[in-house]
């Protein structure tokens, strides 16, 4: 491609509304242009990258024998009403009516559609297992779209769906897709982790997220330094602590704590550390109006874990202070588990404390030297807390460390959630109707592009991994308009590299060298060749890798093979 014939428009200044590096650099390099809130046009440069992502994904999906199809973006409401998600999916579901007042949504995902197709197409166990995928535009009506294409309202996803009759078959396909995702991100040159994850609104029994590691990532990931264990903050657990061996021999004592309402205030007032206290949170229960969740004072409640307890209502709902005072006759800052008279669920780390300070269920009073069993009773012990850096890994191997990541893929073992709701069954080997079970496998095509930039950039611009770069090589002829020798040599290199199937940009624009070099760094082309009169006098061209600050001279008769070897590494 010749730059003079290409739509290459870059910006020096960073747009004011671009908060993160990928958003800034995609706008400055001319990859995208904003149309509206969370809506972006992919310009020719950005589309080249997007297509490379799609091609890698498509190749690896085809290797798993998944079959590509394309489903409608607009979906009938009645399909979503069958599964109950029309009401529960929330405000991100963009709904509409046609001229006959029939309701539809613009699909944020396609579980209902694919299940409807398969319940009509599949009749026998002999047709299973099957796995279908599509690469298609989705829409989620984000209240606050931000970070460019990282959290846009319209985006492109690869979503795949598999159908099975046995858990063993589902697990086999799940493993194949998991490995395919690993190959995809390996080929893209991304540093990532596959982590255990909560199934969330999609549902199911097991899932993994694929997280591209980046300091700007919104997700917290915990991983062991001595094993393969890794999980996101919602799902991460640590080794269950042992209960104290020695009983508390100190006498429980009631003390005044005037106007001390928070854990930090109580701990400071009593001259102790916050990890010597416990806190009691009152939430709505499934069968009881109120349930108490008890954690160590320095721990944070993990709401995703909490709502998985059978006594806790989902979504999690904290009881307001006025109702607590009216019902429990205790102000919020003085609540504790002793004689509380509502179900008490205690976190394992709080239960392991030999003694603790807690609210006394009297205004401005706390107990010191309180102990479980002797003084405080509980209904169940449960993992309620967010893990912390330095916690022991749950597999007993090493300690947990924390990093940030950007979720770019998510695989689920759905089970029969959708098939059962939509009556998707086939005849099994015994001649009986059996509900199918499903897996689903999502990968954010547009998000991968932004995540790659977040991981691969510097102060000058993007540093593309070779597999994703819009062009692999940029040839810059200096003063090509005035020097026939420079022009001819640049053209010769351009044609030779093209003949070897290499994506080459010949930057033949009539611009100053500084502008051409700056644009190359901004766009992030991995390999730069500079053809100049001075270098030609030495029989060389100048080579520079985008990832390096060093330049080197390469003999003209060796430069093509030099580039080919670099690209094929």
Swiss-Prot record:
Its main location: cytoplasm. InterPro entries: aa-tRNA-synt_IIb, aa-tRNA-synth_II, aa-tRNA-synth_II/BPL/LPL, Anticodon-bd, Anticodon-bd_dom_sf, Pro-tRNA-ligase_IIa, Pro-tRNA-synth_IIa_bac-type, Pro-tRNA-Synthase_IIa_type1. Keywords: Aminoacyl-tRNA synthetase, ATP-binding, Cytoplasm, Ligase, Nucleotide-binding, Protein biosynthesis. Its EC number is 6.1.1.15. CDD domains: ProRS-INS (cd04334), ProRS_anticodon_short (cd00861), ProRS_core_prok (cd00779). It comes from the Bacteria. GO terms for cellular component: cytosol. Coiled coil: none annotated. PROSITE patterns: AA_TRNA_LIGASE_II. It is found in: Cytoplasm. It catalyses: tRNA(Pro) + L-proline + ATP = L-prolyl-tRNA(Pro) + AMP + diphosphate. GO terms for biological process: prolyl-tRNA aminoacylation. One of its GO terms (molecular function) is aminoacyl-tRNA deacylase activity. Catalyzes the attachment of proline to tRNA(Pro) in a two-step reaction: proline is first activated by ATP to form Pro-AMP and then transferred to the acceptor end of tRNA(Pro). As ProRS can inadvertently accommodate and process non-cognate amino acids such as alanine and cysteine, to avoid such errors it has two additional distinct editing activities against alanine. One activity is designated as 'pretransfer' editing and involves the tRNA(Pro)-independent hydrolysis of activated Ala-AMP. Homodimer. Consists of three domains: the N-terminal catalytic domain, the editing domain and the C-terminal anticodon-binding domain. Belongs to the class-II aminoacyl-tRNA synthetase family. ProS type 1 subfamily. This is Proline--tRNA ligase. It comes from Legionella pneumophila subsp. pneumophila (strain Philadelphia 1 / ATCC 33152 / DSM 7513). The lineage of its organism: Bacteria, Pseudomonadati, Pseudomonadota, Gammaproteobacteria, Legionellales.
């Amino acid at each position: 491609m010749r730059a003079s014939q290409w739509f290459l428009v870059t910006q020096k200044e960073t747009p004011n509304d671009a908060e993160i590096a990928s958003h800034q650099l995609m706008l400055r390099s001319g990859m995208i242009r904003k149309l509206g809130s969370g809506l972006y046009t992919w310009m020719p440069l950005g589309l080249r990258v997007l297509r490379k992502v799609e091609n890698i994904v498509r190749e690896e999906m085809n290797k798993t024998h998944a079959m590509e199809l394309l489903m409608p973006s607009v979906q009938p409401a009645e399909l979503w009403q069958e599964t109950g998600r029309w009401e529960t999916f929330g405000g991100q579901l963009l709904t509409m009516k046609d001229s006959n007042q029939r309701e539809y949504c613009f699909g944020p995902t396609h579980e209902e559609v694919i299940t409807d197709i398969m319940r009509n197409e599949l009749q026998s166990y002999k047709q299973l297992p099957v796995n279908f995928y599509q690469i298609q535009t989705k829409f989620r009506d984000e209240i606050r779209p931000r970070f460019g294409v990282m959290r846009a309202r319209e985006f492109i996803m690869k979503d795949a769906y598999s159908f099975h009759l046995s858990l063993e078959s589902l697990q086999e396909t799940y493993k194949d897709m998991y490995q395919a995702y690993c190959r995809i991100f390996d080929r893209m040159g991304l540093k990532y982790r596959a982590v255990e994850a909560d199934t969330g609104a999609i549902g199911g029994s097991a899932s993994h997220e694929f997280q591209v590691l980046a300091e700007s990532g919104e997700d917290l990931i915990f991983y062991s330094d001595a094993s393969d264990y890794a999980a996101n903050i919602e799902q991460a657990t640590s080794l269950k602590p042992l209960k104290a061996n020695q009983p508390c021999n100190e006498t429980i004592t009631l003390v005044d704590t005037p106007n001390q309402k928070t854990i930090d205030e109580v701990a400071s007032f009593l001259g102790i550390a916050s990890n010597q206290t416990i806190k009691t949170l009152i939430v709505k229960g499934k069968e009881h109006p109120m349930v108490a969740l008890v954690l160590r004072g320095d721990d944070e409640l993990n709401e995703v874990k909490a709502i998985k307890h059978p006594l806790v209502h989902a979504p999690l709902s904290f009881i307001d202070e006025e109702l607590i005072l009216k019902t429990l006759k205790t102000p919020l800052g003085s609540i504790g588990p002793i004689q509380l008279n509502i179900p008490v669920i205690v976190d394992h780390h709080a239960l392991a404390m030999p003694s603790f300070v807690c609210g006394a269920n009297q205004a401005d009073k706390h107990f010191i030297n309180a102990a479980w069993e002797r003084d405080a009773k509980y209904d169940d012990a449960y993992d309620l807390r967010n893990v912390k850096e330095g916690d022991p890994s749950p597999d007993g191997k090493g300690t947990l460390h924390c990093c940030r990541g950007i979720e770019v893929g998510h695989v689920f073992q759905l089970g029969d959630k959708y098939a059962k709701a939509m009556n998707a069954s086939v005849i099994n080997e015994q001649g009986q109707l059996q509900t199918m079970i499903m897996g689903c496998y999502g990968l954010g095509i547009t998000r991968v592009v932004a995540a790659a930039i977040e991981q691969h950039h510097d102060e000058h611009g993007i540093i593309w991994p070779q597999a994703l770069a819009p062009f692999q090589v940029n040839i810059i002829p200096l003063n090509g308009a005035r020097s026939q020798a420079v022009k001819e040599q640049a053209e010769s290199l351009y044609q030779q590299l093209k003949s070897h199937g290499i994506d080459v940009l010949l930057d033949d624009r009539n611009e100053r060298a500084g502008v051409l070099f700056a644009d190359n760094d901004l766009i992030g082309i991995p390999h730069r060749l500079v053809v100049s009169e001075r270098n030609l006098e030495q029989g060389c061209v100048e080579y520079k890798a985008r990832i390096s600050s060093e330049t080197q001279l390469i003999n003209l008769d060796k430069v093509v093979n030099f580039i080919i070897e670099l690209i094929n590494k």
